[in-house]
């Protein structure tokens, strides 16, 4: 299946009221694209890392009342899940799409990974592109732009990952809905590949 960019109708899904109606809209408009992204980039990540990667499309199965405000496909080296490992995500909120590498609170190795990242603090500050953003909570759309952080700020959020049980850390890019109006499918694929290329050093640090 051909990889397709996200369109305005995909972002509008998150304005649909009600759990059942919004989930039906997600399944109709977004999940087929996430499946295609999953197929494409699980192979890409396997090729880039030499490890088998598997993709996991968010099903939101535990939701009983409140509809999801975002959705995604995640990539990890575990066929059964991704939350317990450093992983990659591609997804969207109503306000933006995102491409991330991260560790969320269910990951038991996040303390060890945080200490490894701290050893490379100056490299992270220098080498991560200025248009990247950091998230400390995957359930919220708020982020910290990399170009606004000093090394001490970066150190603080990485140390928090190690010391706070519920702490998380994700890094990557946001793409505004209007950017997709002039983005071809091929350009979207290239954007994802270049973002993953910039994030792979962090993956390698966290898995050494």
Swiss-Prot record:
Family membership noted in the UniProt record: Belongs to the UPF0637 family.
Name under which the protein is recorded: UPF0637 protein Bcer98_2662
Source organism: Bacillus cytotoxicus (strain DSM 22905 / CIP 110041 / 391-98 / NVH 391-98)
């Amino acid at each position: 299946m051909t990889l397709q960019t996200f369109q305005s109708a995909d972002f509008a899904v998150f304005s649909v009221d009600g759990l059942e109606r919004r989930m039906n809209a997600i399944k109709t408009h977004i999940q087929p694209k996430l499946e295609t992204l999953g197929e494409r980039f699980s192979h890409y990540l396997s090729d880039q890392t030499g490890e088998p990667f598997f993709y996991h499309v968010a099903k939101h199965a535990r939701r009983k009342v409140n509809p999801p405000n975002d959705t995604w496909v995640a990539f990890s080296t575990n066929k059964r899940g991704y939350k317990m490992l450093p992983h990659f995500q591609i997804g969207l909120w109503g306000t933006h799409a995102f491409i991330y590498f991260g560790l969320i609170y269910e990951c038991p190795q996040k303390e060890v990974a945080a200490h490894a990242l701290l050893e490379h603090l100056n490299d992270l500050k220098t080498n991560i592109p200025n248009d990247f953003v950091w998230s400390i909570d995957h359930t919220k759309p708020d982020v910290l732009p990399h170009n606004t952080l000093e090394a001490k700020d970066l150190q603080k959020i990485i140390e928090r990952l190690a010391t706070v049980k519920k702490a998380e850390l994700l890094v990557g890019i946001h793409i505004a809905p209007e950017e997709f109006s002039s983005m071809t499918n091929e350009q979207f694929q290239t954007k994802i590949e270049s973002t993953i290329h910039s994030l792979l050093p962090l993956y390698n640090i966290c898995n050494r």
